[in-house]
Amino acid sequence: MSAVRAADWLPGALRDAPAEPPAQPRLLDALLSAIDRQRALLEDDIDQVYEDFFIESCAEWAIPYIAALVGLPADAGRAEVASAVALRRRKGTPAALEDLAEVLTGWTALAVEGWQVTLWAQRLGHPPPPRAAAVDLRSRARHRLGTPFEPARRCVTPSGRWNPRTATALLWPWQLRTLRAAQATAIGDRRYTLHPLGVDAPLYVRPRPRALATRTASQLDAPLRAGYRVLESLGDVEYGDRWRLGPEHPLLAGAPDAPPLISLTAGNAPVPPEALRFGSVPGGAAPPAPAADEVVVDLARGRVHVGDGFAAGIRATFHRPVSGRLGALAGDAPADVGARVVVTVDRDATPSAFVVTTIEAAIDRAEQLCQDDPELRPEDSLPGRPDVEIRLATSDRLPPPAPVAFAPKLPRWRIVAPALLTPTIGGTLALDLEGACVTLEGVYLRGDLELGAGLAGVELVNLTMNPVAGRAVLVSPDAWGLALGARRCLLGPVRADLAALPIRLTDCVVDGHGLGLAGCGDPVPGGAATAAIDARERFAPGLVADGVTFAGPVSAETAQAVDCVFVDGVEVVRGGEGCLRHCYVGPEPLPRPTTYRCLTEPVPRFVSERFEAGGYYALDLETDQPLLTAASDGGEVGAYHHARRAAGLNRLRRRIHEFVPLGLRAEVEMAPWEER
C-alpha cells in the first residue's frame, strides 16, 4: 500500500489541525481516514489481480480457472497446475513419471520399468550392461532382495511390475520429518531414548535432496527405515556384536543438522561419526558397556548407549515418518510479530530482560513486563492476536512450571515452539489464568494437561501427548465458561464436564487405547484401554468435531461431527440435538443423534494403532474400504482427511497412463509399511 495519505493532497491550511485540540474529532479527519481505508482496500484488490495471473501466487478460487487454461480439470491442485507444462514436455521418461507421482501425492516415488526387472533373452544388439544372470549373489546389492530396490530379475507375471510391458510408479506413503537437537531421555547406565517422550521410535534414512528431472536411483533417495540390511547394502560394514560402518559409508556423511541417518552431541560437543556402533540397547538389564570412545545406536528402538568418554547431556538429530501434518513434529508456527510482549525461553542463551531459561520464569517475566508498562491496556487486546507470546526457542526438555494460577493483566497468551524446533514440557502442565485465553502450540507434553476453572479459552495446536503413558487432557469440573479447542493434535483421553460451550476438535487423533511400538522381544507398552471422551466427574461435555479419529468410546451430552471416525462408537445423552454427517459411527447400537450418510460397517482398517508409528491411525490405502471415499468432499474420513491421501492416489491412477509410452500398461503400487 502507498505511504501517501489523502490528507497530503489538501492544502496545508485545511489539512493541519488547529493549535488547540477540539473537544471532538474533526469531521474532516474522519472523512480522510475513511478515504484512506477505502483506497487501501482498492490497492490490495489491484495487487491481488496481478497475483492472480500466476499459479504460484493466485488465490485459491483462481486455481481451477488457470487449470482449465492448461487442460487440467477443476480439482487439480496448485502444484499440479504449476508443473503441468514441464511434465508434459518430458512425457514417456521414468523421471517424469516419478515427478508426476510426487506432485500428485506428495510422496517419494520410484519408476520401475518392467523390462528392466524381468528375465528375457538378451540379443547382441541390446545395449549394455549384459544380463548374464537373474541376480548376482556376490554383489552387495543382494541385501536389497525383497525391497523396492532389489536387483533380481524375476519371471514374467501377467500383472504387477514384473512384466516387460509394464511401467510402475512405486510410492512410499509417508514423509519424513526431522527432530533437530532433541534432548534424549536417560533410562539408566548411560543409556538414552532419543524420542522426546521417551518412547521407542525406530530410525529412518533421510532421502538425498533431488534436483529437477533426476531419478530415485538408490536407497539413499527413499524414506526407508534404517535396518541392518540397509546398512549392508549401502556400503562396507565391519561385523561383530556391534557393527561399525566403513569410513566411506554414505550414512556417515552429511551436515550435522541434516544427517542421512543420525547425528549426536554429548555435552554440546559433536560425537564423531566414526565413534558410532550399531547394536542392541535393551531397556532391562544393562548390556556390556561400550568402549569409552564409542556410542552404540539401536536402530530398531531409537536408543543409544554412550561410552564413559563422552559427557552427559545427549542431543540427537534424526528422522521420523508421518502421514499428515499432525502433532508437534509437524508444527511450523511462525512467530507473531504483532505480539505486545515477547519472552523467549532458551537454555543456551545468556539470560536478559526478554530471555530466560525456564517456562516458569518466562510466565513470571511476561506478567511483570505487562504490569510495568502502563501503555499495555487490556481493552486494546485484539482477537486472533496474542498480547503475550512465550517462544520456546529450544528442542530441550523443559521442566514444567508450578501450577499457573493468577489473574493476568492482558487476556491473550500464546506459548509456541518456532518452526524446526520441538521442545518438550517434561511433566504435567496446570494452567488457570483468570479470564485468559491461552494457545499452546507445537510442543511435546510428557504429563497431563490440567485446565482450571478460571480460564476463558484454551486452543491446542500441533500438540503431542503420550497416550501410551495414560496422559490426558483434564478440565476442571467447574470450568463452566471454558472454550476448549484443538487443531492437528495427537491427544490422549479428554476428561471434561458439561459446560456452556462444547469441545471443538479439528484434524486430531484422540487415543484412548494407548498402544505403543515395541522392539523385537520387548513387551508391548501401554495400559488398559479407556474412553476417548468422557465426563470428568458429573456429565459428559458437548462435542463438535471435524476430521477426527476417536480411538475409544465417546460419551457426550450432544455431538455434532463431520468426516470423523468413532472406532468404538459414540453415545450421546440428548440425541435430538446435533448431527453426525459422513462419519463411521461404530457397529454398536448406542444412542446417538441424527446421522446423514454415516457408515456402521465395515470396521476401519488402519495401518497401525500404535503411537509414533508412521501410519498411526491412518486408514490403510491398499485395501478397498469405503471409508476412503466416505467424507463430505469424497476423500477419506478421520484425522488424515486434511492430507487428501486417497484423493491424490486416485488422481495419480487416473492420470498415470498419460505419461507412459503407447502400448505399455501403467501401474501404481505402494511400498510396504515399515512399522505396524
Across the structure, where does each feature detected by a protein language model lie?
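N-terminal extracellular ligand-recognition/capping segment immediately after the signal peptide
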Residues: V81, D348-L429, Y444-L449
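Short, glycine/acidic-rich beta->alpha junctions
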Residues: R89-T93, V103, F354, T358, ...
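Acidic glycine-/aspartate-rich tracts in secreted/extracellular proteins
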Residues: F310, S395-L398, E588-L590
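Surface beta-loop-beta hairpin patches that serve as ligand-binding interfaces in beta-rich domains
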Residues: F310-A328, Y596-R676
